[in-house]
Amino acid sequence: MRKETLLVICFLTLVLGTVAVIWSYALPAFKPLNLGHAKSAVVSVGAARQERALNPGELASLNQWIETHRRGWGPLAKTAPSSGDAVVSVVTDQGASYRLILFTGLSGADWDNTVIVQAGPDAPFRVHDFKSSVFAPLRQIAEQGTYQRSAPP
């Protein structure tokens, strides 16, 4: 085998090996979220984190929203400005739990209409920002309860 051929083979092996390693880490981020059907949910809203259970209509709306928005979630690459304006804690039919952290624009305008999902206690955070019309069902769930809003900074 000639020296040039060996160098080309080594170079291709190095490049393809690097690509394979990168894709093995990146591929799980492209899988759609499979959160499961929500059996019950509690929303914590406002600075005081006042809790209330979701009624059956809100639960149906949440399940429909989750089912239609399984794709497009990416890893959380930067620190969120706060712990969210509302947190929806969900228990599925299988007994698993996950959290939806909603940013409605109160704690950071650039995080408006953003949702962070944590599919379990040790699961990584996944984030997605939405258009106002797509985020509207979640905003309605978050803002339906009465709570005292904190003063702007």
Could you say what each language-model-derived stretch is?
Residues 2-153:
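Function-determining sites in protein domains
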